């Protein structure tokens, strides 16, 4: 099989037992194809390359098992995430809708003859049907399939709380407490803390990992809920296949809006969608609505679905590091694109180019950087020799230990965000009706309710009471209000030069720890219907238990986005703001 070129070419050579067995395996795969392989040389060569790897690593059963699961759930919409979209065989078998030839994705991230571990296939289903999919699998393969477990370990906070309980504290513990305030001996409590840290606290369910075994499992290993009482490390030596059956609220939202349009059927270019994304008008767009994504969309001004795909990869830590991010925004050129590690596949291509190896060996070095394998990293640096950009390359690849995306995953996620943005641009009511059901993002509840009201929807009626018409009372009790007007009294007022004073309702926030061990707090405030401002506060700021932030800052402008750099501020409960 060393010189395998195409399925047909191999058939003519099937004269010895090895070739006959290989042909049988290829026939098993091709019989499950749901698409016809194009005749162009790049497709035929890629197909031959993948067949050779699959057969040499004996992965035929795995691919057929994934196809069996999809056949079992063909009436349920799905979307494959992860690196499966790197494989032409996966595309032809209908496991993924990403064509790796069209998207120029090397297969090494998914299939690599230098590795003997199974490739990873993750399948997204609507979140409300995840359990149904799992139950179908358990029913189809009883005793041979089970959900994997996670061990929950004691960390700093949980160990501290457990120590307090073991030393006699009853009832709820404050979010921030000291042992002294509870009348507990701190020396003994800290001794218990140290003993607990890193120990098992309990067993939980994996978010979606399903194990498929070739033989019956001992009943002692399986719980009543079909959960194997082992974690991913403990099952490593057992003969099994693993597939992740995951839930995706964005997919649920899109299907709710229009179940007839497939994800890959949305137009790649649409002026209204591009305009919406360029304004950063992405509230309610699941997985694309964070403040960072809003700013990124304003910066790059997506003109197509391809740009949206690019943005989903660029926002990840691997691509969004300091100088490279700033340089990318200021130099939006093809040369700059090829010079930056945006997706993990870019690292493979870059490594192969730098040291003159094939993509498979390059992927092993990529994995070494991602897993912090110092011996393998040093081997790569030695092969790099006296390259003039050696230090820059090392810093760039070191960032692979952060959370990045392979290009195939970015394609699927970017297409989902583009499709949701398309629906928001063309079907506001349908979009917000689905968003209220499925979009559970990081914004406060009132944000989604307010945006839905602006789109013409009437959200669920608030229970009748003698204070029914008071929006502030409704906000305190329910987290939102029914009046179409915004809560009164919030403002931004220009003082002088770049100074501005503000008061707004907290919509979203997050505290980040920078590389210099300093903290920065990002907060989004609502000022009026459809009017939000972003704040940066150069310290950890206790916003989460309050409602309003009021203060003074400097107005800043960067990459088509305005924000306020806070000079002084105070955080208030809503009662105090109105008193």
Task: Kindly label every feature range from the protein language model.
Residues 12-579:
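Noncatalytic, beta-rich nucleic-acid-contacting surfaces in large DNA/RNA-processing enzymes
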Residues 5-7, 11:
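Low-complexity, intrinsically disordered or signal/transmembrane-proximal segments
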């Amino acid at each position: 099989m060393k010189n395998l070129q195409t399925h047909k070419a191999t058939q003519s050579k099937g004269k010895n037992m090895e070739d006959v067995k290989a042909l049988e395996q290829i026939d098993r795969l091709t019989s499950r194809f749901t698409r016809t392989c194009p005749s162009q040389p790049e497709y035929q060569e890629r197909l031959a390359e993948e067949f050779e790897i699959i057969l040499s690593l004996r992965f035929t059963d795995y691919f057929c098992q994934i196809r069996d699961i999809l056949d079992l759930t063909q009436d349920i919409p799905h979307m494959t995430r992860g690196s499966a979209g790197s494989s032409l065989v996966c595309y032809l078998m209908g496991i993924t809708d990403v064509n790796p030839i069209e998207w120029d994705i090397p297969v090494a991230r998914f299939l690599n003859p230098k590795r003997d571990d199974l490739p990873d296939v993750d399948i997204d289903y609507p979140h409300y049907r995840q359990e149904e999919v799992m139950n179908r699998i358990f029913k189809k393969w009883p005793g041979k399939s089970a959900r994997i477990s996670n061990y929950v370990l004691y960390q700093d906070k949980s160990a501290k709380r457990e120590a307090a309980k073991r030393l006699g504290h009853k009832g709820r513990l404050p979010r921030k407490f000291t042992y002294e305030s509870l009348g507990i001996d701190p020396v003994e409590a800290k001794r218990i803390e140290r003993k607990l840290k890193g120990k098992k606290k309990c067993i939980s369910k994996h978010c979606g990992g399903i194990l498929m075994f070739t033989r019956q499992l001992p009943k002692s290993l399986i719980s009543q809920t079909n959960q194997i009482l082992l974690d991913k490390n403990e099952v490593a030596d057992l003969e099994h296949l693993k597939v992740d059956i995951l839930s995706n609220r964005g997919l649920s939202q899109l299907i709710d809006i229009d179940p007839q349009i497939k994800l890959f059927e949305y137009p790649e270019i649409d002026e209204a969608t591009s305009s919406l994304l360029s304004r950063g008008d992405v509230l309610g767009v699941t997985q694309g609505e964070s403040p960072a994504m809003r700013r990124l969309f304003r910066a790059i001004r997506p003109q197509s679905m391809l740009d949206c795909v690019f943005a989903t990869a660029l926002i990840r830590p691997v691509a969004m590091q300091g100088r490279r991010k700033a340089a990318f925004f200021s130099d939006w050129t093809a040369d700059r694109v090829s010079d930056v590690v945006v997706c993990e596949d870019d690292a493979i291509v870059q490594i192969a180019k730098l040291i003159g190896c094939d993509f498979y060996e390059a992927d092993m070095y990529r994995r070494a950087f991602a897993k912090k394998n110092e011996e393998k990293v040093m081997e790569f640096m030695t092969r790099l020799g006296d390259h003039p950009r050696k230090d820059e390359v090392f810093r760039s690849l070191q960032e692979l230990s952060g959370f990045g995306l392979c290009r195939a995953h970015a394609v699927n996620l970017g297409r989902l965000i583009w499709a949701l943005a398309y629906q928001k641009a063309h079907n506001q009511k349908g979009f917000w009706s689905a968003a209220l059901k499925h979009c559970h993002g990081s914004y406060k509840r009132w944000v989604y309710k307010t945006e839905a009201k602006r789109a013409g929807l009437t959200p669920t009626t608030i229970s009748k009471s003698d204070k029914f018409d008071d929006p502030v009372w409704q906000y305190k009790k329910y987290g939102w209000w029914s009046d179409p007007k915004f809560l009164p009294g919030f403002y931004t007022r220009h003082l002088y030069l770049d100074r501005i004073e503000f008061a707004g309702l907290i919509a979203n926030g997050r505290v980040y720890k920078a590389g210099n061990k300093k903290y920065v707090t990002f907060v989004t405030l609502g000022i009026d219907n459809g009017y939000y401002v972003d704040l940066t506060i150069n310290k950890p700021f206790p916003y989460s238990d309050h409602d309003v932030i009021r203060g003074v800052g400097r107005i800043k402008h960067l990459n088509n986005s305005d924000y306020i750099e806070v000079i002084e501020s105070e955080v208030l409960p809503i009662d105090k703001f109105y008193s």
